[in-house]
From Swiss-Prot:
Binding residue positions for S-adenosyl-L-methionine: 13, 15, 40, 62, 87, 106
Gene Ontology MF, one: 16S rRNA (adenine(1518)-N(6)/adenine(1519)-N(6))-dimethyltransferase activity
GO cellular component: cytosol
Protein name listed in UniProt: Ribosomal RNA small subunit methyltransferase A
Subcellular location: Cytoplasm
Gene this protein is translated from: rsmA
C-alpha cells in the first residue's frame, strides 16, 4: 500500500485478507470473455486477483485521486485493465460494453446502500454482482418478513435478485479495521423480471412509501380497493408482506391508476 492512507470521507477500509479476496473472485466465476467492473479499486488488492483470472477486460472505478499513481503503476503492464477516474454514480455502465457485466467491489460503508439500490437499474446488463458490505446491510438484503432486518432494501432488491449471504468477514481483515463486521454477498438477477425496467423507479418509490412509518397499517397509505384487489389485508403492515405481495400490490396500483386515467379522460 506504500504511503497510502485510507480516507474516512470516502469510507475506505482496504481489504487485506488474501483468503477473502480469493473467495470474492471465486464467487465471480470469471471467464476469459467476461467484462468485470470493480467499484472502488483502492490500492488494487482485489483488482490484482481478478486480473489473474484473465477476463476480457476489467474496469476499475475510483474516486480518490491520491491512489491513481499507485493503481497506474501497479497495473501498467495489464492491457485488459482500464482505470475510470470518476465517482461510480457519474459512470454509465451501459457505455462500457455491448454485452453483460460482472460487478464487484469492497463498497465504502457510507454509500454502500445507495450503490446496491442503484445496481438494480443495471439489471438488464448485469450477469451477477459480488460485494463486500457491512454485515448489518447484508442481513437486510436477505431479510425475511416480520423481522427487524426486513426493510425497503430487502423487498426492492429481492424483487430482482436471488441474493446469497456468502460469508461474514471480521474487522481485522481490513486496514484500518472498521468498527463493525462485514460480509460478502452475491446477487444473481432473476431470469424473469417481475417488474419491468420502465416501472422500476416507480416500484422503488412505491415500496419506499409503504415502508415509511413501517408500523402504520397499509390502509392509511394506499387505497382500500387496491388492497382488496391484491388480496391484501388493509390492517396489515408493510413488514408483514412477502416480496410477492409487494409485486402484486404494485401491479394492482398501476392498473388502478391507469383505469382512473381512463375514467377521467
Amino acid at each position: 500500500m506504500g504511503n497510502f492512507r485510507p480516507k474516512k470521507r470516502f469510507g475506505q477500509h482496504l481489504l487485506i485478507s488474501k483468503g477473502v479476496i480469493q473467495k470474492i473472485v471465486e464467487c465471480l466465476d470469471i471467464k476469459e470473455d467476461d467484462t468485470v467492473v470493480e467499484i472502488g479499486v483502492g490500492t488494487g488488492q482485489l483488482t490484482e486477483e481478478i486480473l489473474r483470472r484473465n477476463p476480457k477486460i476489467v474496469y476499475g472505478i475510483e474516486i480518490d485521486k491520491t491512489v491513481y499513481p499507485i493503481i497506474e503503476e501497479r497495473f501498467k503492464d495489464f492491457k485488459n485493465f482500464v482505470l475510470i477516474k470518476e465517482d461510480f454514480f457519474d459512470v454509465d455502465l451501459r457505455k462500457l460494453t455491448d454485452g453483460k457485466i460482472k460487478l464487484t467491489g469492497n463498497l465504502p460503508y457510507n454509500v454502500a446502500s445507495h450503490i446496491l439500490v442503484n445496481t438494480a437499474f443495471y439489471i438488464d446488463i448485469l450477469q451477477l454482482a459480488v460485494f463486500m458490505i457491512q454485515k448489518e446491510v447484508a442481513q437486510k438484503l436477505v431479510g425475511k418478513p416480520k423481522t427487524k432486518d426486513y426493510t425497503f432494501m430487502s423487498v426492492f432488491l429481492q424483487t430482482f435478485f436471488d441474493i446469497d449471504y456468502v460469508m461474514s468477514v471480521p474487522a481485522r481483515f481490513f486496514s484500518p479495521p472498521p468498527k463493525v463486521t462485514s460480509a460478502v454477498i452475491r446477487m444473481i438477477p432473476k431470469e424473469k423480471l417481475p417488474v419491468s425496467l420502465d416501472h422500476m423507479k416507480k416500484y422503488k418509490n412505491f415500496v419506499s412509501m409503504l415502508f415509511s412509518n413501517r408500523r402504520k397499517m397499509l390502509r392509511s397509505k394506499i387505497d382500500k380497493d387496491i388492497l382488496e384487489r391484491a388480496g391484501i389485508d388493509p390492517k396489515a403492515r408493510a413488514e408483514e408482506l412477502s416480496v410477492d405481495d409487494f409485486i402484486r400490490l404494485f401491479s394492482e396500483h398501476l392498473l388502478y391508476k391507469h383505469d382512473g386515467k381512463n375514467e377521467n379522460s
